[in-house]
């Protein structure tokens, strides 16, 4: 497994959610996972479908959540930010039991590939 150090520098403010400001990775093989979407009635249901897909992609390369060094999240509605944060608050301690949450960039955009999708999450992992 790659040597990964996820941390928050003292010179930066505390993260606003389940993420860290910095992921330092000693040169490693990288795994780029395309943005994942999932149908569902609301943001929680869609997140509950998206993250297992990411996990399957990680497992296909012999990796797991501990290999993730970056998430990029796209939301269609700013009012879904609290629901997305609640999902992470509930699920990330199980996925990242050491509390080293990967950096995450969250963008609110006009729409995704199909109107039914509310969230898309892309991941980068170091192997």
Where are the model-predicted features located?
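N-terminal presequence-like segments and the immediate start of the first folded domain
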Residues: 1-70, 75-127
């Amino acid at each position: 497994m790659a040597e990964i150090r996820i941390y928050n520098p003292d010179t930066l403010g505390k993260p606003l959610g389940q993420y860290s400001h910095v992921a330092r990775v000693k040169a490693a093989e990288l795994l780029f996972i395309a943005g994942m979407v999932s149908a569902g009635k609301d943001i929680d249901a869609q997140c509950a479908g998206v993250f297992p897909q990411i996990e399957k992609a990680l497992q296909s390369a012999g990796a797991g959540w501990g290999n993730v060094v970056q998430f990029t999240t796209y939301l269609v509605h700013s009012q879904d930010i609290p629901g997305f944060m609640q999902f992470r608050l509930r699920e990330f301690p199980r996925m990242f039991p050491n509390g080293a949450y990967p950096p995450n960039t969250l963008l609110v955009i006009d729409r995704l590939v199909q109107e039914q999708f509310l969230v898309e999450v892309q991941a980068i992992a170091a192997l």
